Curated annotation (Swiss-Prot):
Taxonomic superkingdom: Eukaryota
InterPro entries reported for this sequence: F-box-assoc_dom_typ3 (IPR013187), F-box-assoc_interact_dom (IPR017451), F-box-like_dom_sf (IPR036047), F-box_dom (IPR001810)
Species annotation: Arabidopsis thaliana
Protein name in UniProt: F-box protein At2g15640
Domain F-box: 1-48
One Pfam family cited in the UniProt record for this chain: F-box
Amino acid sequence: MNPSTITNDLTVEILSRLPAKSVARFHCVSKQWGSIFGSPYFKELFLTRSSTKPRLLFAMAEKVNEEKNCVWRFFSTPQLENPYEKSSSTLVAAAEFHVKFSPDKLYICHCYDLKYFSIGYASGLIYLYGDRGEATPLICNPTTGRYAILPNRYTYRKAYSFFGFDPIDKQYKALSIFYPSGPGHSKILTFGAGHMKWRKINCPLRYDRHDIKSEGICINGVLYYLGSTSDCVKDGHGIVSDYVIVCFDIRSEKFTFIDVERFCRLINYKGKLAVIYWEDDVDIYKLYYSDVDEYVEYNINDDDINELRVWVLEDVKKQQWSKYAYTWTDDRFFRRRVSIAGGTASGEIVFSMLKYTPKQPFYVFYFNPERNTLQRVEIQGFGEVLKKTCRVCTFVNHVEDLNVHDFKQLKSVHPPLVDEPDSESD
């Protein structure tokens, strides 16, 4: 075919099938391609195609010194559709390596204690905010390595941070919640809004000083996380439980709260908030054991058949839930090495291992509540890049969205986009 006869529509159709990393690279090939990639039509077409093939995103934190400074590596693998139709007890999926992320002269740290967290995800972007407020806060694209540094969040005390996306105004916001003890103000930052700065934000008096018990998840423009009200003054405030789900509307910047009966895990279940209760689940923040493994060893029986309860929030204002219960054969492997990554669009609950160890298999598990079946999937390919034990954060439903490849917001590029092999002496 003569190149001159290729229509613009056909060019757009062909280019829309490229991976996001290639689109980022080819942006400067020609003015025509740059114009195509930047058009709203192309971005929506690309997003539509990408949304039909969601992926699991793996963020791997490798410690490089004793001060918790680390290198992040990002991988992804196709999110399996109907994994239970295969006959094998263990399926295999290949991980695609995207980028080794450790910009020069930037202190990027990660807390390796399972009780704490230092990374957030929302609509295709990663928010790295360090160990409870330490280090340089930044937002990066895990596919291309482009990033933007945020203003430092100065506080009397350390604070927890969360990351959310408003699909109406197409805005990302970072939320910083201060510790319940001591002075401090919660603050919020709008990403890409001219001169970025942290603004004070007030939490309603009822739960003004709540402790943080989970990572945040953002669903349809609302950020959710689990809080503890044990340090709140309960008299006259109507607080009926030690735990509460904090709901923060990204667009209006308003807080609402949902009381829950005890410690639980939060996931996005078919576009709705859901909480998961294990029969003997425990708030690891309250453990007197220094090691979660020690608690599991002495308190979890391999032969126990527990009840896994899934509550789906149907009406936020009325706080109405659909409640489901499933028998769950628990074991030490799940409690010691696996965390809940989230829920797929078709309703599977995805569990992922917390750590990658060289020369040992790495698994994710798809649990189908309706069928009460569990499918194990071995993820291969990490060992080609990783040579040390790493902490793993897994995110479900990762979709490549060109709207987050905004060259005006993510100005800095972190080359190379391919990893460099470690030397024999490392």
